[in-house]
């Protein structure tokens, strides 16, 4: 049934994402977009996890793909190791409700309820965006409370260069 077909594919796809470096690419894009902002690395974790969630649908694959880059960045900026881990775990968990792929449960819902998967994905879009907005705001307020700055512009990748060189 659904479990043996789709769960196997999630595991296989997660391994593929790791080998191809897509997790690093998402972190680099997120860094270019938000690394400069107050508390930059934590906001990078939120964006990169949302991006990875669009293709993996697995919180574990998401942590592996982006957490190995974002957690050390957050600790280097001054976040506690506990907060850095919590941000990555929270942001990565959102990948399970981030369309279009989402978690295996979305496929099960579509099958059990008898609606097309695309309807389940459309219904999840607004809650997923609200979830990530909540994580972003939590990160923002903690960064302001702690006086944490972003990453200097000269240390950030240029998003246009990233898209031209690695966005294929």
Regions found by a protein language model. Give the residues of each.
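Core transmembrane alpha-helical segments of multi-pass membrane transporters/permeases
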Residues: 1-24
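Hydrophobic alpha-helical transmembrane segments
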Residues: 4, 42-44, 121
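Flexible loop linkers connecting adjacent transmembrane helices
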Residues: 23-34, 70, 146-157
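Hydrophobic transmembrane alpha-helices that form the pore/transport pathway of multi-pass ion
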Residues: 27-95, 105
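Residue-level recognition of pore/gate-forming positions within transmembrane alpha-helices
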Residues: 50, 92, 111, 127-128, ...
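Helix-coil boundary and interhelical linker segments in multi-pass alpha-helical membrane proteins
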Residues: 110-126
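Long, contiguous bundles of hydrophobic transmembrane helices that form the permeation core
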Residues: 122-168
């Amino acid at each position: 049934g659904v479990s043996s077909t789709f769960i196997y594919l999630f595991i296989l796809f997660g391994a593929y994402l790791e080998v191809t470096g897509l997790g690093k690419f998402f972190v680099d894009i997120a860094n270019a977009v938000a690394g400069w902002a107050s508390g930059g690395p934590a906001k990078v974790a939120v964006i990169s996890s949302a991006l990875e969630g669009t293709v993996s649908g697995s919180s574990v694959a998401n942590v592996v793909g982006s957490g190995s880059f974002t957690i050390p960045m957050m600790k280097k900026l001054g976040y506690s190791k506990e907060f850095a881990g919590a941000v990555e775990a929270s942001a990565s968990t959102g990948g399970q409700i981030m369309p279009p792929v989402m978690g295996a449960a979305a496929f099960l819902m579509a099958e059990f309820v008898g609606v097309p998967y695309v309807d389940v994905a459309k219904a999840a879009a607004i809650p997923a965006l609200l979830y990530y907005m909540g994580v972003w705001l939590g990160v923002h307020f903690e960064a302001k409370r702690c006086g944490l700055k972003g990453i200097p512009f000269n240390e950030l990748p240029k998003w246009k260069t990233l898209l031209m060189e690695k966005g294929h």
